[in-house]
Amino acid sequence: MERRGVPAVGAFPSSFSYGNDAVKAPSYDPEEAKKLLEESGWTDTDGDGYADKDGKKLSITWLTYPTRLEQPKLAEYAQSTLKDIGIEVNVNNTADHATYAKNGEFDVYVSSLTTAPTGDPEYFFTSTVVSDAAKNYGKYSSSALDDIITKMHETFDADERGKLAIEAQQTILDDDAYFFVSHLNMGLVSKANVSGLIAHPCDYYEITADLEVK
């Protein structure tokens, strides 16, 4: 990643007590993946390099967008890597990704987002993960997850909220509902007439009384 980011395990970086090291996600094992496909009846019967079953090629649509430079590159990498195990990836790299997402026209939707803009974990779950979340484009639904987030909403102790955030992340990881790729190391550039700008993990807190534009 050339120091531009760190591999992600969960939704939050390790700077949070409930971040990366607090949860576990499956590692990528291509040989085991091939084995699982074969056990499910997906094999390459026509020699084109892709698994097929009952005359149908194993093909998925990968939805992303071009305004974040890393997104098309990630799609290309997935296209190459998944081909090695027999899965065809058709990339839809479009500025109109939101429309496709809302219409459910994807198998994998990859986007970038700030999961804790105010330094609190609840936002990510309520906006993206719970059953009625506005950005739950994959229609993931788990009563167990919803109950955890309801409890988080009613809990004010920071340590307890952190524990619930760990439990919630582990739930969606165990359900294979979401996967996380990287946590970016962001760089800030300002003009010479800007002073008092200090980088902060939560971008709301970069706007302070010391920030001045002359």
How should these model regions be labeled?
Residues 3-7, 16-19, 66-70, 96-98, ...:
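Solvent-exposed loop/turn segments at secondary-structure junctions
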Residues 21-22, 66-67, 86, 137, ...:
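A generic structural signal for short
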Residues 1-5, 17, 38-43, 80-87, ...:
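Sec-exported extracytoplasmic/periplasmic mature domains
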Residues 1-77, 167:
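Append "and occasionally in soluble cytosolic enzymes with long acidic Gly/Pro-rich linkers
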Residues 18-35, 45-58, 102-104, 124-154, ...:
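Short, solvent-exposed loop/beta-turn-alpha elements that line the ligand-binding surface or hinge
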Residues 44-115, 186:
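Ligand/substrate-recognition segments at binding pockets and active sites
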Residues 8, 29-36, 70-74, 78-81, ...:
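Stable alpha-helical elements in mature extracytoplasmic
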